[in-house]
């Protein structure tokens, strides 16, 4: 079973192809939800040396970044591709 962890946002790399799918309205909606209810769904990241690569959860990551959070909850997964 995977263990939920807090990852430093500054160490999470978002691949260029993922960044093109960013919707600012969705980020705002998720940020509002996080303010009201906390982060409900962890993101998925994989390790890449000293950093982590985002596998799933772009809008949640950007919402936490927008809110000024230093960390985000997620699961570390074993994945070669994203």
Describe the predicted segments one by one.
Residues 1-78:
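Short, charged/polar connector segments at secondary-structure boundaries
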Residues 82:
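Short, charged recognition helix plus adjacent turn
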């Amino acid at each position: 079973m995977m263990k939920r962890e807090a990852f430093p946002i500054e160490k999470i790399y978002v691949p260029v192809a993922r960044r093109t799918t960013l919707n600012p309205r969705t980020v705002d909606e998720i940020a509002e939800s996080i303010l009201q209810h906390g982060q409900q769904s962890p993101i998925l990241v994989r390790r890449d040396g000293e950093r982590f690569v985002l596998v799933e959860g772009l809008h949640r990551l950007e919402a936490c970044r927008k809110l000024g959070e230093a960390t985000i909850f997620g699961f570390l997964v074993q994945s070669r591709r994203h």
